[in-house]
Amino acid sequence: MTKYIFITGGVVSSLGKGITAASLGRLLKGRGLKVALQKFDPYINVDPGTMSPYQHGEVYVTEDGAETDLDVGHYERFIDENLSHYANCTTGRIYQTVLDKERRGDYLGQTVQVIPHITNEIKDRVTMIEKENSPDIVISEIGGTVGDIESLPFLEAIRQLKFDLGKDRVLYIHVTLIPYIEAAGELKTKPTQHSVKELRSIGIQPDILVCRTQKELSEDLKAKLALFCDVDREAVVQLPDAESIYEVPLMLAREKLDLEIIRRLGLECKQADLKEWKELASRVHRLDKEICIGLVGKYVELPDAYLSIVESLKHAGFQYNCEIKIKWIYAEKVEKEGAEELLQNVDGILIPGGFGERGIEGKIATAAYARENRVPFLGICLGMQCAIIEFARNVCQMKGANSSEFDPDSPYPVVHLMPGQENVANKGASMRLGGYPCRLVEGTLAYGVYGVSETSERHRHRYEINNEYRKEMESKGLVISGISPDGQLIEIIELKEHPWFVACQFHPEFKSRPNRPHPLFMGLIKGALDYKEEPDTASREG
């Protein structure tokens, strides 16, 4: 029968519950167990799809088209499996479902309340994965911090699940902070004691404490935490700050967290196989080269807005023993100061996805700089659309070419709304979302790095390249190297006579894994390494 692990957080937010959950998933999978992960977010939005990146960070898209929390990206990357829409659920989704049931009369005249109706719906969401995929372990992360009003229904639901499922099938892990007081030179346990007290007042006694800390915990301190938080000494696990998130599974393994879970849940499993992960973690410290990638975006002051892109660049860098330095560049700053001023010292350029007109001309100027100076370039989603606009304006001499998103009256709408998107009223979950097949054209750069004739990639967009201008742009040197099976949607473009100028309509960052970097990121990093090794600036400018 499926066993359940619930991860809560205490003292402060942003402790790394998601990384802890993902790392635990990796450890248990390494022992031959089938693992599923999910995240519950206590906000009232139905999903993060319409939220500002400044509020939420990136929106991570699953293979089946769900717009989810960025922690789902960590889950997929660490356990190296595709998750589904079951991996993320919000308060808004729960309430929407309950209200829909009430309107249909499913509750047969009952007064609909937080308990039992909301909590029952949460419990159904937790156990739904068991019915769909029959995993050995479901790891559920509860967003927010213990003590938040918003999290109370979720905490009550997971409290009830121990009663419903049985004590031998449920385990609670509390991730907490042990702050170091510089003036006193001491680590303090009192915040954790109060956090556990708050959790116990709700009816949940944590089985294991994962203690985030800047300093090593002494045996005396661990014993104190065990005594006052009423957990076994072996269940006090320290998790110091790590140089790389990919070290965290090994740090938890050294603390024997997986063994403690196996013992408590009575799991039967094989010896841990972490050979591949150990090699990955050691590679992080053997990087003997360095390149700089200029990332030109709208939300660069919040790197979490581009989290999967950052991790994908790192994955490719690991394969080439290369450290990736990212130069974060405001697209609007490019408009004011010029592309050459800001990009002259980078080894490669990436324009990520985004929405809205702000900074667009800066991104278009960036694409022009990469094309004219033969700088390795990767455009993603809106990044590809900007590259197309630039090519149409400056190579095809289509004066005023633009996307109908930014200029509905453009004489050359080289990017336009996809069919069926014209009169969409509700913005949530209405884009082209999730995995779609893409056919690759032999003899192209894209085909060379993929090494296959067809692949599947994840999308999140409303606009597409306008096929009306396709032939004219191809006649001027645009290469269409990836296309939908019906031949209608341009998925990947590149340029003739350029060593690496590739752009795609989809989001390759959602398919990259630390042990299997995405081919397009591999191509960008290889191109950047070659570019950096060119003998002089003149040759770079071609």
Swiss-Prot record:
* Cell division listed as a keyword: no
Q: Name one GO cellular component term.
A: cytosol
Which residues are noted in the entry as UTP-binding? 13, 188-193, 224
Q: Quote the record's activity regulation.
A: Allosterically activated by GTP, when glutamine is the substrate; GTP has no effect on the reaction when ammonia is the substrate. The allosteric effector GTP functions by stabilizing the protein conformation that binds the tetrahedral intermediate(s) formed during glutamine hydrolysis. Inhibited by the product CTP, via allosteric rather than competitive inhibition.
Could you name the active-site residues?
Answer: 381 (nucleophile), 507, 509
Identify the EC number(s).
6.3.4.2
Q: Report keywords, A-Z.
A: ATP-binding, Glutamine amidotransferase, Ligase, Magnesium, Metal-binding, Nucleotide-binding, Pyrimidine biosynthesis
In terms of superkingdom, the source organism counts as Bacteria
Q: Which GO terms fall under biological process for this protein?
A: 'de novo' CTP biosynthetic process; pyrimidine nucleobase biosynthetic process
So where does CTP get bound? 13, 148-150, 188-193, 224
In this protein, which residues make up the domain named Glutamine amidotransferase type-1? 292-534
The terms under GO molecular function for this entry are:
ATP binding; CTP synthase activity; glutaminase activity; identical protein binding; metal ion binding
Q: To which pathway does this protein belong? A: Pyrimidine metabolism; CTP biosynthesis via de novo pathway; CTP from UDP: step 2/2
EC class (word):
ligase
| Short name of one Pfam family | GATase
Q: Which InterPro entries match?
A: Class_I_gatase-like (IPR029062), CTP_synthase (IPR004468), CTP_synthase_N (IPR017456), GATASE (IPR017926), GATase1_CTP_Synthase (IPR033828), P-loop_NTPase (IPR027417)
Q: How does it assemble?
A: Homotetramer.
PANTHER family to which the protein is assigned, alphabetical = CTP SYNTHASE, CTP SYNTHASE-RELATED
Which family does the similarity line name?
Answer: Belongs to the CTP synthase family.
Q: What does this protein do?
A: Catalyzes the ATP-dependent amination of UTP to CTP with either L-glutamine or ammonia as the source of nitrogen. Regulates intracellular CTP levels through interactions with the four ribonucleotide triphosphates.
Q: What is this protein called?
A: CTP synthase
